[in-house]
A protein has these predicted regions:
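Beta/alpha (TIM)-barrel catalytic core signal, keyed to glycine-rich beta->alpha loops juxtaposed to Asp/Glu
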Residues: 135-295
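N-terminal binding-site loop/beta-alpha segment at the start of enzyme catalytic domains
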Residues: 1-88, 112, 125, 164, ...
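Short, acidic/polar
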Residues: 27-39, 107-121, 158, 162, ...
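Active-site gating/metal-coordination segments in enzymes
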Residues: 95-131, 208
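Conserved, mostly hydrophobic/aromatic
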Residues: 6, 18, 32, 47, ...
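N-terminal small/glycine-rich loop or linker at the start of catalytic domains
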Residues: 7-24, 86-102, 131, 136-145
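Phosphate/pyrophosphate-binding loops at sites that engage ATP/ADP/AMP, CoA/4′-phosphopantetheine
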Residues: 77, 116-125, 195, 293
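Active-site mouth loops of central-metabolism enzymes
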Residues: 20-30, 97-112, 148-156
Length: 295
């Protein structure tokens, strides 16, 4: 499988990345091991996780995914050398009090401590790509549309966060840095400050992108192109809506698999993917695909 360079970093990854947010919730450890083994056998060299996972987030499964991956790596001698390992530090708690005691900020100290925790759980010496999971700033992320300047505190500055990330890079604990759920403004500021002050340059932005989520095309695409920052597109199948498995039954109707994510978790149905318009659009895309002999 060919490799793609991430931004201006020295990381080269396969076009397919294994996302792991279900490990520790829908997917138990034994099944997760099978998935990881299969992925490695098929040539995928890129694994992404986060300290917040498993999803849907709750206190009982906080950090669970990293622990499972760490157990797998410790039992697979030689696997680590073949892989690009990416994880994320959680942003402000945002109604998740188990994250740093409900802090509304992500300080430099928080970043340093979170990195140590991820290294320990993953049982590795260096994180190849370390990402900020969502901004400290109030932004329309996770299905939001409109920017609300009056909501939320600005918190720790981007400059201070970059300085903390620089310490991790200099210590050999992180190779490259990235962002997630970011805006064009945020990406531009991270790159501008990095270039102005000689700090680590963002290599990637991990945002949702699919037929049902085209927000990347609202100026973020140009920003990434001009600044040479790579997009890591998450939820390409829109939480399973684009697989067609909900087309006939709906999200909770008779015949729906009880283990299907949007059926099993009410919290997921209350978010962007559970909106009636999302299912209606997915059904129309499925019909269009069938008309053209596509799956």
């Amino acid at each position: 499988m060919k490799k793609i360079q991430l931004g201006q970093s020295d990381l080269h990854v396969t076009p397919i990345c294994l996302g792991t947010m279900t490990f520790g919730e829908q997917v138990d450890e034994a099944t997760a091991f099978d998935i990881l083994d299969r992925s490695l056998e098929r040539g995928v060299n890129f694994i992404d996780t986060a300290e917040m996972y498993a999803v849907p987030p709750r206190a009982e499964t906080f950090n669970a995914t990293e622990k499972i991956i760490g157990n797998w790596l410790s039992q697979r001698p030689g696997a680590r050398q073949k892989l690009v390992m990416a994880t994320k530090v959680a942003g402000p708690s945002r109604n998740m009090p188990w994250i740093r005691g409900g802090s509304p900020d992500l300080t430099a100290k928080d970043i340093l401590e979170a990195c140590e925790g991820s290294l320990r759980r993953l049982k590795i010496d260096v994180i190849d790509l370390y990402q900020i999971h969502w901004p400290v700033r109030s932004v329309p992320a996770f299905g939001g549309v409109y920017y609300q300047p009056a909501s939320g505190s600005e918190g720790t500055s981007i400059h201070a966060q970059l300085e903390a990330l620089q310490l991790l890079v200099q210590a050999g604990k992180v190779r490259a840095i990235g962002l997630s759920n970011e805006t064009p403004y945020g990406v531009h500021e991270f790159v501008r400050l990095a270039e102005q002050y000689g700090l680590p340059r963002v290599a990637t932005v991990q945002n949702g992108y699919s037929l049902l989520n085209r927000s990347v095309e609202n100026a973020l695409d140009e920003t990434l192109h001009r600044l040479n920052v790579s997009l890591l597109a998450y939820s390409p199948l829109s939480f399973g809506l684009l697989t067609g498995k909900y087309d006939v039954t709906g999200l909770t109707g008779p015949g729906t698999s009880p283990e299907a994510r949007l059926t099993k978790f009410e919290s997921s149905r209350k978010q962007r993917w559970g909106r009636p318009a999302a299912l209606a659009a997915a059904r129309r895309y499925s019909a269009l695909a069938r008309e053209h002999g596509l799956t």
